[in-house]
Swiss-Prot record:
Residues 510-542 form a coiled coil. It comes from Arthroderma benhamiae (strain ATCC MYA-4681 / CBS 112371) (Trichophyton mentagrophytes). A zinc finger (GATA-type) spans 250-274. This is GATA-type transcription factor sreA. Pfam families: GATA. The gene is sreA. Residues 1-172, 210-248, 289-408, 461-525 are annotated as: Disordered. GATA-type transcription repressor that regulates iron acquisition genes through specific binding the GATA sequence elements of target promoters. SreA targets include genes encoding a number of key iron-regulated factors such as the siderophore biosynthesis genes. Is dispensable for growth on keratin substrates. SUPFAM superfamilies: Glucocorticoid receptor-like (DNA-binding domain). Residues 75-117, 148-168, 210-223, 396-407 have a biased composition (Low complexity). Induction: Expression is repressed by the transcription factor hapX during iron starvation. PROSITE patterns: GATA_ZN_FINGER_1 (PS00344), GATA_ZN_FINGER_2 (PS50114). InterPro entries: Transcription_factor_GATA (IPR039355), Znf_GATA (IPR000679), Znf_NHR/GATA (IPR013088).
Amino acid sequence: MLTLRSSSDTVRGFPATKRDMIRQPSAEDLDAAHQLVSSARGVADLRPDSFDASRSPDGDKASVDTGAAMDDTASSDQNHSESQQQQQQQQQQHSQASEQVSAPESSSRSRASPKASRNTEVFLGHQCVPTNRIRDSGANANSGYANSSTSDPRASPAASDASAQNASGCGSTPAGTCPGGGSCNGTGGAVGCDGCPAYNNRVYKAAPRAPSARQARASPSAQTSEEQAQSGLDALDSASQDASGMPKACQNCGTTLTPLWRRDDQGNTICNACGLYYRLHGSHRPVAMKKTVIKRRKRVVPALRDRSPGAGSSDNSSVSPELHSASLATSNADTNAYPPSENGGPSYGAAQFPHSAPPPIDFTGYYSKPTQSTSSPGLNTLINHSPNTKKRTHSESTSAESAPPATRIQSDISASAHLPPINPASARALPNSGRLSSISSLLNHTDPSFTESHVDAALGSNAPARSQTQTQPQPGTRSYSPNPVNPPTTQPAHGSHSIPPPPLTPAADDKVKAARRAQLQREAENMREALRAKERELASLK
């Protein structure tokens, strides 16, 4: 039989070395310490029923068994040194059996100690965030204990739903009355108020914000560092806010609505308007200039901005309908870009409506096609053989001067065909007129009736001296009619224009020159008369 002695008598009977061995932590103490650290890290929740279980009679009985085993070992060491090894083996077997029974109770007793309760208070104190909400430590609970299957009231579905609603409600801001479109009153509510500094300074920074899920799942060490950073931010916010929790007002005008806070030379907080006024004028802005609505640049809201604070009041925003329709078209295009898969989600395979490039078009011969003309063949021949618009060289000008008069007349006609008409109304009334203008008709008329009716009396003796080449119409030329309503007639070309006329004798050449001189004088007089008629017509229209 084993005799039971008190633990104090057992300790007194041991030598000093054995007392030190007894004071060393045992396996139970180490296990209890490990469980305490695990609970402090959020692995398991502390419950009051564990404290009650530690004071049960079973726990007292287990402690008596452990003390009896220790007394048995001490008596065997004192009485029989020969049978010490045998008793140690028995003690080891007995201690192993007692450890299996008393391990949960000893751990419960160690957790119920005052030191454990102090650690529990510190742990619970760390779980409280600045928003006075207790952090749910059961989010990452992967307990390895048998009693961890019991549910915690804080982790119930109703409580979790309430916490989710609280988190979503704290971050949301009430709908404001900002008109938008560059007029800002700092309350928000328009589509462009999401990134407005005045709105953020006044409303958004003062709104309560709940901790995010990432912060709730952080480790204790990371939580400690985040709490320190949050405390620093809270200190800065409290320094820039008054007792009501809103940002401080301007020291000069008292406004709380500004896109940018400034400081004067004394370090006082002033608004943006007062700061700019002080910088430009060197004096503080008068209070009478304070306005409740500030003018800002009109914000261009992206097409897919559907999560802004003012998304619900988009009817009062200043965004054009074209932008709204473009955003709807973009969202519809993104929705229909991929066909739905079998499981209901979008299939990221081949797109249902692939974006194809426009068909290629060859513009190589666009500018090289010849222009088709509806004029007469003789006129086309003259225009095609006419010189270009560039300045002529010396050889070309010399050859033009030495050419026969008929050739020069034809070149004059072809050159004058590119001039704009003087009278657009008469030019439009001429059918099949091509590009010939009234100037060319005035300068190159060959109508005998017109010549006889407009011949000067002083030059009448020289009129019969005209050569046959002047009286006969040139091939491909137009005859002039004094009445602008009657169109000039085109004489048909009987021969090829590439064959030059035969050379003239000197006497005939002098006659041609004299006739040409008289013709030019008559044409100049006719042009003066036509100009006077047009001036009279313009005067009558005034």
